[in-house]
Amino acid sequence: HSGRDLVQNHLSFFVLNHAAIFEEKLWPKEIVVNGSVMMDGAKMSKSMGNIIPLRTAIRDHGADPIRLAIISSAELLQDADFNMESVSGIKSKLESLLDECSTLKKGEIDDLQTEDKWILSKTQSKIEEITEAVEKMRLREALHEILFTFESDLSWYQKRIQAKERKNVSGILHQINSTRVAMLSPFAPHVAEEMWEKLGNVELVSK
């Protein structure tokens, strides 16, 4: 894993040197490169004063929001445009999800109605789509599905159950949000563990 700007020198010689010195089974199988990280659309530079030390950013906002802001700004080969507005928005989204998890309790799932079957089917589809995106290193797409598209589906479901004045849906919401937290875990491991605990689990979600 390296920077895109090193393809024409260091990384090329890395491959050539291995091919010249070692037998084929020891040659590199794959090199993953990423783009540059911009700050508010501009190249990071000490002279411009737009560099935020990593320790400072983590201290002020937490590791998970910083990580998610970078991932959500671009796919792997693209330049990531980092900005504090995105960090604040993601931090707020994580706090909202954490609060929601604290209100949900495990419960029996009654006879499924049409909207229940719909949201459970959408959740299964999301698992497949997000898994495929992660396997193909489309991390921005995967994260967008977890944080935002998932939210849209849940919002539609909640409108349907409110219209019917249904009350006993905690079991379904708990199951769906447990799935969502499990998928969020590789991207935001710290807050995902907090959410998992709020959902009443004892073991780590990362297990």
Feature map (PLM): residue ranges:
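Short histidine-centered catalytic/ligand-binding loop motif
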Residues: 1-2
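Helix-rich, typically C-terminal accessory recognition domains appended to large enzymatic cores
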Residues: 5-15, 19-28, 56-207
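Beta-strand segments within the central parallel beta-sheet cores of soluble alpha/beta enzyme folds
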Residues: 29-33
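Short aromatic-centered micro-motifs
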Residues: 37
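Generic structural signal for well-ordered beta-strand positions
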Residues: 44-45
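Residue-level structural signal for beta-strand termini and adjacent loop
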Residues: 49-50
